[in-house]
Amino acid sequence: MNIHEYQAKQLFERFGVATPKGIAASTAQEAAQTARNMGLSQYVVKAQVHAGGRGKGTFKNGFKGGVHVVKSVEEVEEVAGKMLNQVLVTKQTGEAGKLVSKIMVAEAVDLKKECYFAILQDRARECPVIVASTEGGMDIEEVAATRPEAIIREHINPALGILPFQALKIAVALELTGPLLRQATKLITNVYKLFTALDCSLVEINPLVVTTDDRVCALDAKFNFDDNALYRHPEIMEMRDETEEDPREVEAGKYDLNYIGLDGNIGCMVNGAGLAMATMDIIKYYGGEPANFLDVGGSATEEMVTNAFRILTSDKNVKALLVNIFGGIMRCDVIAQGIVAAAKNIDMKIPLVVRLEGTNVEIGKKILADSGIAIIPADNLDEAAQKAVAAVK
C-alpha cells in the first residue's frame, strides 16, 4: 500500500522527523486559504498522485509540471486551479496519466545540499538496509548503474535496531559536518523507528536536504507498507486512496486474489506466484504479451475462479485467457468445475486455453471436455502458451 506525500509528512511529524510543513487541499479556494493561514514568503504547490516524476510531468490540459514554487497566495490559487481535477501524465503513470484530486501547499525552502536516503528490506540478508547517497534529487537507479561507488549501504540488525554509530556513520558518509551531524543522526534514527513501528517495506526520502538556514529535513517522501501487517495499523488503512489504485487490483483484493495489471492482451490465471511468473515469461517467449499477474493461491473455490474470470475479462484489452494450474494441494477436478461454472456464469466470449497438471488431472480434463464449452486444452506449458498466443493473432 502507498500513501500520498502530505500523508507521509503527517507520519514524519508524528515520529519527530524534520520536514517542511505541508497541507492538502481539494479546491483552489481551499489551497489559497491554506497558504494565507501559513503566511509564508513563498510556497510550493504539488500535485498529489501516486507516481514519481511529477515535476517534469504535463497535464492533459497543457499545463506543465506537477510541482510549482510560487510567491503569493494568488499564485497558489491559480496554480492549484490548473492542477485540480486534471490528468497529470508522468514517466511513471503511462499515457493514461492520473487524475489530481488533491494538491499540497507546502513551505518552500532554499537548499544548499540534496541527498538520497531510504530504508527498505534486504530479502537476501533478511534485515533492513539503509541506502543513501550524496547525489540526491536524482533517479537513484541511474546513480547505482553509472556511479555505484556513490551508493552507501548499511544493514541493520533487527534484534538491536539502529545503533548510534550507524546513524552517525551514514551522516558522515553524506558529508555532513558540525551541528548538521546531530540533526541528521536524530532524523535517521527516527525514520528507522517509523519504519519498524509501522511495518513499512520502504521509506524513501528523495531529497533529504540541508537548507540555507542549516536545517536537515525530509523534503519529499515515498512510503510502501507491508499489506500483510496492515491489520495492525488501522490508522494507516484510513490513509488508503483507492482512486489511485488499479480498480481491478482493488476488486481482486476483496477476494484474496493476488492481481497486478499489465499492458498485454493474454489474461492469465495461475496458482502459485512462481508458476505465474513462469507463465508470463513463456507467453513473452512465444511472442505474446501477458495482460496481468494473477495468483489464485492453493485453495481456490468456484467463487474465487468466477471472480478471477470476471476481473480478467473486465479488461477490454484481454483477447484470450490462459489458465495454468498445477494441482498439488489444489485438485484439478475442483478447479475444472470452477472453470466450467465461471465460464458459464460470465458468458465467456473470448478464447479460453486451459492447462491442468497434478492431482486428479484426468478427472479434471474430462470435466472440461464434457462441459460443452469451447475450451482449448493443452497438455504442457509450452503448448498452452503457443495456443494462447495463436488465439490472439
UniProtKB/Swiss-Prot annotation:
Residues 9-251 form the ATP-grasp domain. It catalyses: succinate + ATP + CoA = succinyl-CoA + ADP + phosphate; GTP + succinate + CoA = succinyl-CoA + GDP + phosphate. The keyword Ligase applies. Pathway: Carbohydrate metabolism; tricarboxylic acid cycle; succinate from succinyl-CoA (ligase route): step 1/1. GO terms for cellular component: succinate-CoA ligase complex. GO terms for molecular function: ATP binding; magnesium ion binding; succinate-CoA ligase (ADP-forming) activity; succinate-CoA ligase (GDP-forming) activity. The keyword Glycoprotein does not apply. Substrate binds at residues 271, 328-330. Keywords: ATP-binding, Ligase, Magnesium, Metal-binding, Nucleotide-binding, Tricarboxylic acid cycle. ATP binds at residues 46, 53-55, 109, 114. Its cofactor is Mg(2+). NCBIfam families: PRK00696.1 (NF001913), sucCoAbeta (TIGR01016). Belongs to the succinate/malate CoA ligase beta subunit family. Succinyl-CoA synthetase functions in the citric acid cycle (TCA), coupling the hydrolysis of succinyl-CoA to the synthesis of either ATP or GTP and thus represents the only step of substrate-level phosphorylation in the TCA. The beta subunit provides nucleotide specificity of the enzyme and binds the substrate succinate, while the binding sites for coenzyme A and phosphate are found in the alpha subunit. Heterotetramer of two alpha and two beta subunits. This is Succinate--CoA ligase [ADP-forming] subunit beta. The lineage of its organism: Bacteria, Pseudomonadati, Verrucomicrobiota, Verrucomicrobiia, Verrucomicrobiales. The gene is sucC.
